[in-house]
């Protein structure tokens, strides 16, 4: 297996050797979050260009950050971001349609050596020709990555699709996982359709004349927050093709029309194919499990009750956030991840 590295041009050599203590009040978290996410930085040709301003807004040193890639056993490539020095202690898995950069602010706040992985079909990782993005399939890739890139069991954190992928991994390779944190997803939640505005966003064309066109479309549908936040999200989740057209990096956008046509919005009980095996995987996990429910996300109070009924030893925490907790409450999420001494961070 081959590993390729591309080192970020920005880092602080005076990185603190001590963990960041995030035990202040939630109002402070909200203030820091506002500063970190509302910094208006110019889009350039570097995926790392946003990090210095984000770290400055948080008041933390910017660790070394690099993009790494692994040639998988079947010839595909799995890509990731590595934050910090030393062996990774934490691995972060994003949700459908996102990429490793969704964790940037959380990773900076946590200040620990970690990996943020682009799942297959997302970011800089290869698309699958069979379009199989079931959690167990995705977990096989992450297993190869952790075998290659880590030397100790991981605090494995997965949001949405990444959470179910983490459960599948923890069930089959308990030696790789010290603790599993599942963010705003349970196997009983069907997120395949998503909000109506999200369906409208992906139901249109798959390529565009410019990133600016996508920014305008996203903002017209209420996505992305401020213009600066929307520009950052679009820049980090798109690429410019050889013909000059802009397309989403993730395969899901290109599969959206077919998936949306197959979904019956009138059948609320229709199970998502991605989640059918999730309960079995979670029941097989031997590591401690925490469910993080977003108060304004996809997991309801009843879903959380069912989660604890099936997994009585699991812990459930609630954060004031929307579904993408790592983007709307990243500092509070980092505080939660750092709050238990048993996690060793």
Which residue ranges define each predicted feature?
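Conserved HGGG/HGGXW glycine-rich cap/lid loop of the alpha/beta-hydrolase fold
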Residues: 76, 81-124
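Active-site loop/oxyanion-hole signature of alpha/beta-hydrolase fold enzymes
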Residues: 73-76, 119-157, 335
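Alpha/beta-hydrolase fold catalytic core
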Residues: 1, 10-11, 17-88, 111-112, ...
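Conserved alpha/beta-hydrolase catalytic His-Asp/Glu region
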Residues: 209-264
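Gly/Ala-rich beta-loop-alpha elbow adjacent to hydrolase catalytic centers
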Residues: 158, 162, 166
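Flexible "cap/lid" loop of the alpha/beta hydrolase fold
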Residues: 171, 178-212
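Catalytic histidine-centered segment of alpha/beta-hydrolase-like enzymes
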Residues: 322-330
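Conserved serine/cysteine hydrolase catalytic core
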Residues: 244-309
């Amino acid at each position: 297996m081959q590993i390729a590295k591309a080192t970020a041009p920005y880092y602080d050599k005076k990185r603190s050797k001590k963990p960041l203590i995030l035990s202040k009040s939630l109002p402070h978290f909200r203030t820091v979050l506002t500063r970190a996410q509302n910094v208006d930085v110019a889009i350039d040709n570097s995926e790392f260009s946003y990090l210095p301003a984000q770290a400055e807004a948080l008041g933390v040193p910017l660790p070394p950050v690099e993009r790494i890639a692994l040639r998988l056993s079947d010839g595909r490539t799995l890509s990731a971001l590595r934050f910090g020095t030393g062996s990774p202690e934490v691995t972060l898995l994003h949700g459908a349609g996102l990429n490793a950069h969704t964790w940037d602010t959380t990773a900076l706040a946590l200040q620990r050596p970690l990996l943020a992985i682009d799942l297959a079909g997302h970011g800089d990782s290869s698309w699958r020709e069979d379009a199989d993005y079931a959690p167990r399939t995705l977990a096989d890739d992450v297993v190869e990555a952790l075998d290659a890139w880590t030397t100790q069991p991981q605090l494995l954190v997965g949001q949405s699709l990444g959470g179910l992928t983490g459960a599948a991994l923890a069930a089959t390779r308990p030696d790789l996982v010290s603790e599993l944190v599942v963010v705003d997803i349970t196997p009983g939640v069907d997120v395949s359709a998503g909000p109506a505005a999200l369906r409208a966003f992906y139901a249109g064309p798959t390529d565009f004349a410019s990133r600016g066109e996508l920014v305008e479309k996203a903002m017209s549908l209420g996505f992305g927050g401020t213009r600066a936040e929307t520009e950052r999200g679009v820049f980090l989740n798109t690429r410019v093709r050889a013909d000059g057209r802009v397309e989403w990096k993730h395969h899901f956008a290109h599969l959206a029309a077919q998936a949306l046509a197959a979904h019956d919005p009138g059948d609320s009980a229709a199970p998502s194919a991605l989640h059918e095996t999730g309960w079995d995987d979670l029941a097989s996990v031997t590591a401690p499990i925490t469910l993080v429910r977003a108060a304004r996300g996809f997991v309801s109070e009843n879903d959380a009750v069912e989660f604890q009924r099936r997994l009585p030893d699991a812990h459930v925490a609630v954060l004031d956030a929307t579904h993408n907790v790592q983007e709307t409450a990243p500092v509070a999420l980092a505080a939660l991840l750092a709050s238990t001494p048993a996690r060793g961070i």
